[in-house]
Amino acid sequence: MNPEHSPLGKATVYANQYDASLLFPIPRAGAREQIGIGAPLPFFGTDIWNAYELSWLNARGKPQIAIATFYVPAESPNIVESKSFKLYLGSFAQTAFESADAVRDALKRDVSAACGASVTVRLATPAEFRKLQMDELDGLSLDRLDLDAHVYETDPSFLTASHGEAPVEETLVTDLLKSNCPVTGQPDWGSVQIHYVGAPIDHAGLLRYIISFRNHTGFHEQCVERIFVDILRACQPVKLAVYARYTRRGGLDINPFRTNYNQPMPDNARTARQ
């Protein structure tokens, strides 16, 4: 299915009963082909979705709420278009379920089917909300740099590394990522963390490269994969991980993670802007 056939940018009828058919899958392959990603993938990872507007009825008709987190493997053939995800979650609101476990099972079944891979789903109930803390991405901030930036279309020529110098291990972060929805043109705001081992990457060039996404159109997952492959090709690090946390829209935030080496799942603590 193509994005132009999705619910994005169209008049919406909100379902009042649970409806799994509202989920709109979009194949990953098309966007990957555009940036030269084929099989085998040069990375693995996860897309972490947090859903803050989930509610259903219990068996006695009383509304229940939870925050749902979805872990979608990067190896899945499809992503789910975000507005369709919102409409799907909204369809739970007037539907009775026996328990939170029954809701979680339905979410796992439906989203896994849409993505074409097994998706992990976790529900945080109100009793657990106090445990959900805010935090910022760890790393040296690129935003401290005082520099000129005038290029707002993706330009990987900014990416350079000093291959004559000793390898380093660095974690770099910036809050200046902005891209745009390819269907509606709405801005997507995010923070990105880049961890690598290899020749030192020029910090100013890396920040200018991230800033160059400002007029770029692409879904969150596609932007992170473009960042990953551009850095991998231009700077040739031995190890590379890219993790972005995008601000919420429609009750959902999307946080893609890509890496080429084994490591623990990144922390899902939301940032202040989320």
UniProtKB/Swiss-Prot annotation:
Principal localisation: cytoplasm
Q: Molecular function terms in GO for this entry? A: preQ1 synthase activity
Q: Where is the signal peptide?
A: none
Q: Which family does it belong to?
A: Belongs to the GTP cyclohydrolase I family. QueF type 2 subfamily.
Q: Could you describe the subunit structure of this protein?
A: Homodimer.
Short name of one Pfam family: QueF_N
Query: Which reaction does this chain catalyze?
Result: 7-aminomethyl-7-carbaguanine + 2 NADP(+) = 7-cyano-7-deazaguanine + 2 NADPH + 3 H(+)
| Compartments reported by the entry | Cytoplasm
User: According to its UniProt entry, what is the function of this protein?
Assistant: Catalyzes the NADPH-dependent reduction of 7-cyano-7-deazaguanine (preQ0) to 7-aminomethyl-7-deazaguanine (preQ1).
Record has NADP as a keyword: yes
Source species, please?
Answer: Burkholderia pseudomallei (strain 1106a)
Which GO biological-process labels does this protein carry? queuosine biosynthetic process; tRNA modification
Which residues are listed for NADPH binding in this entry? 82-83, 249-250
Write out the pathway annotation from the protein's UniProt entry.
tRNA modification; tRNA-queuosine biosynthesis
Q: Which residues form the active site?
A: 181, 188
The name this protein goes by in its record: NADPH-dependent 7-cyano-7-deazaguanine reductase
EC number assigned by the record = 1.7.1.13
Q: SUPFAM superfamilies this protein is in?
A: Tetrahydrobiopterin biosynthesis enzymes-like
Q: In which domain of life is the source organism classified?
A: Bacteria
